[in-house]
Amino acid sequence: MTTEFSYLTFSVFEISDFNLFIETVKVIFKKQLITGKAEIYSEIPNPNGWVNPQSGGSHFPKFSCWQNKIYPDKVFFISNYEEGLFNVCRIIQKHLRCNIITCALSDETETDNPFFKFYFSNSNLEERLIQAYKEDRWIFYEEGKPLSFENLDYYKRRRITDRLNNNIIKEYMIRLGIDINTIDAQIKAGIVYVRKKW
């Protein structure tokens, strides 16, 4: 995955059956697909084309999902919405009853409002959320039971930007067996969902 971005949000579903994932997406968006308000294209996506998504919700949502040879038991998800179409991901997860991870990373030198997020939900829908973001000031927020791989000492640091940042998120992902730099490598299957009308 590219390291040159202002903002990047993606999700990871722990599921090996990509066809089941696609069928679940089709069920969730059945009405939009039948009425021609949306289309699903079977294609190998270019995830780097989805970095720096737009903020707000005035544009038509699009998202891309793929599976690669490096992580055959994972499906990756990225969208054209700054918040990563998080609610869509949660709906998919509830249908599949699988683990999901959502990460948001920022380049503090490129954006006025950096946002860092690590979210994990297991198949029982138990949630863990950690966030550090800047509005008028820096804010750190966490909820849910800490996971075994977390370093809780990070959250005691004085500077909020040292409690959760790109490096810590990447570290946590490595501990979960995922190198962010390789999630878009050796893609073997993918789809793109495009909403065309409201």
In which residue ranges do the predicted regions lie?
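Surface-exposed, low-hydrophobicity interaction/linker segments
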Residues: 27-54, 123
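Charged interaction segments
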Residues: 47-198
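Short, extreme N-terminal segment that most often corresponds to the first beta-strand
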Residues: 1-35
